[in-house]
Amino acid sequence: LSGPRNQRITLEAEPGIWLKGSESELRSAFSNLVFNAVKYTQDEGSIRIRWWADAQGAHLSVQDSGPGIDAKHLPRLTERFYRVDSSRASHTGGTGLGLAIVKHVLMRHRGRLEISSVPGHGSTFTCHFAAAQQITGTV
């Protein structure tokens, strides 16, 4: 996934957590978050992916050690075509639609996206799904 960039990717997943919904849409949203982390994390950086459940529901978080994002940009990150800065956009490519698609998919699945970031310390994107969206038992 990260190729010659030598990024360390860690996956922590609780077994037996399933969601009701469109597999292709959820896969698209989750992979978008992971690919963004790979794209914006420097060589030798780290990415942590977590999948867990608690009393509130199921959660997926993607945390990276990338450049981070200034707080003034966070409210607009899920707008279509919004870019933090054009110089970063020309370096990394993309359309500016990825996080808008993630937000749309989560809304269709009664979920929400939480974004936290500190410039120079990376970002964390967390998808939260209500307990009602979970499937219990074996699928």
Residue ranges and their predicted role:
Residues 44-56:
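Short beta-strand/loop element within the Bergerat-fold HATPase_c
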Residues 121-123:
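Glycine-rich GHKL/ HATPase_c ATP-binding element in histidine kinases
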Residues 64:
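Acidic ATP/Mg2+-coordinating residue in the GHKL
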Residues 69-81:
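Short conserved segment of the HATPase_c
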Residues 37-38:
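Short helix-loop "hinge" at the ATP-lid/N-box region of the Bergerat-fold HATPase_c
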Residues 8-17:
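Conserved catalytic submotifs in the C-terminal HATPase_c
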Residues 110-111:
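Conserved glycine-rich
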